[in-house]
Design a protein with these regions (language model features):
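N-terminal hydrophobic/helix-forming segments and targeting peptides
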Residues: 1-193
Length: 193
């Protein structure tokens, strides 16, 4: 009996597009649309709601149902204020872990497009050894390479519901450029870059 392939080019292309799509908490629609477009040939109907849920239904009249559930949003932040020296301070949007933020590359979504930045916090040589503080929402910031608040604002960044999402977790299939036969026999190596 021939084995049916689970991963093929179409499914890998979908997975890469889906995982690399920005879908911060409260703004999941683009990710859900990708998911629904991919599943359209396999389901009979979709149900969506104002909470960001998207459900694909197969055989809606069936007495018994099977649910496969997943979480669609990603970690994100809102711009809280911009300092005079061009550093951007943020607040959480959902359950973001500030402890892992320093040195993460981020995308700030603006009307002018994506602005790249990196999370920072006071350099080790500027921190008191007697009072070594861990990263906290109050002492971490995003640096976009500007020296003044006005320069940050010219990029389109402003205080308010601007979503900041991780840019350092790009999904790539490492061996997809190899022949499909190699992938089938060796499996697929994936990474977060």
């Amino acid at each position: 009996m021939a084995k049916q392939r689970i991963l093929n080019k179409k499914s890998m292309d979908f997975l890469e597009a889906y995982l690399n799509n920005a879908a911060p908490t409260g703004y999941e629609w683009d990710g859900q649309k990708l998911w629904m477009d991919y599943l359209k040939p396999y389901v009979d109907e979709f149900i969506t709601d104002t909470y960001g849920s998207a459900v694909g239904v197969i055989n809606p009249e069936a007495h018994y149902k099977v649910v496969i559930e997943g979480h669609a949003d990603e970690i994100s932040w809102y711009v809280n204020y911009i300092s005079d020296n061009g550093l951007i301070y943020v607040i959480r949007n959902g359950g973001s872990d500030h402890q892992i933020a320093p040195s993460k590359v981020v995308n700030i979504h603006t009307k002018k497009g994506i602005v790249k930045g990196v999370f920072g916090w006071p350099a080790i040589h500027t921190r008191s050894r007697a009072k070594e503080e861990p990263p906290k929402p109050e002492n971490i910031f995003i640096d976009v390479g500007c020296k003044k608040k006005a320069d940050v604002e010219k990029l389109g960044v402003h205080v308010g519901p601007m979503t900041v999402s991780s840019a350092s977790t790009r999904f790539r299939a490492l061996v997809w450029s190899c022949s499909y036969k190699r992938i089938k026999s060796k499996g697929v190596a994936m990474c977060s870059l």
